[in-house]
UniProtKB/Swiss-Prot annotation:
Record function comment: Involved in ribosome biogenesis. Required for normal pre-rRNA processing in internal transcribed spacer 1 (ITS1).
Native source organism of the sequence: Schizosaccharomyces pombe (strain 972 / ATCC 24843)
Amino acid composition bias (Polar residues), ranges on this chain: 12-47, 65-75
Gene Ontology CC annotations of this record: 90S preribosome; nucleolus; nucleus; preribosome, small subunit precursor
Key words of the record: Nucleus, Ribosome biogenesis, rRNA processing
Protein name according to UniProt: Ribosome biogenesis protein slx9
Region described as Disordered: 1-88
Similarity field: Belongs to the SLX9 family.
Subcellular location: Nucleus, Nucleolus
Keyword Transit peptide belongs to the record: no
Length: 172
């Protein structure tokens, strides 16, 4: 299937709007012009006809409309100055309100610090080499076997663990 031919002018666009018979109708070919008015140039007819408005004309119109937004100020200069002055005054910080809040913040911080539990240093993960991990494992196994062989643990294990925890937590 061949490519569709690209339209290169607005005239071809206008021809596509013709009635299905292919012939322009009587109303489409004759513009609405009063008999008493005289046309001074062909450019006026082209500018009034939306089908023949060029891309350049459209761009000029769009640019003109865009410029009109800035040429008509919406507010007077005194109102603009008044608004700017109020905005500057609202930016000033009231330090007295901060001074009233500071004691409450200090109290909250001290309460939060007192609630923090001390971190047990042994529970922190530290980087260990393979050999130190192996040595610690062997020491832990020996310590656990010594506890299991202890006579107080053999007689009453729960009481011994409770006593050990009480002694170790009091020292910390």
């Amino acid at each position: 299937m061949p490519k569709a031919k690209k339209r290169v002018s607005l005239a071809s666009k206008a021809s596509s709007r013709l009635p299905s018979s292919g012939k322009p109708s009587q109303q489409a070919s004759i513009p609405n012009v009063e008999l008493s008015s005289t046309v001074t140039s062909n450019s006026q007819v082209l500018n009034n006809d939306p089908l023949k408005e060029t891309k350049k004309d459209k761009r000029k119109d769009r640019h003109f409309n865009w410029q009109q937004k800035f040429s008509n100020p919406k507010i007077s200069a005194s109102a603009r100055k008044r608004r700017n002055r109020k905005a500057r005054e609202n930016l000033k910080v009231n330090v007295s309100s901060i001074g009233e809040v500071l004691p409450e913040i200090d109290l909250d911080i001290s309460v939060a610090n007192s609630r923090l539990k001390p971190v047990i240093k042994d529970s922190l993960s530290s980087k260990q080499t393979k050999s130190s991990m192996k040595r610690n494992t062997v020491e832990e196994i020996e310590r656990f076997q010594a506890i299991l062989k202890h006579p107080s643990f053999v007689s009453n294990p729960l009481e011994t663990v409770r006593e050990h925890l009480g002694n170790s937590l009091d020292s910390r």
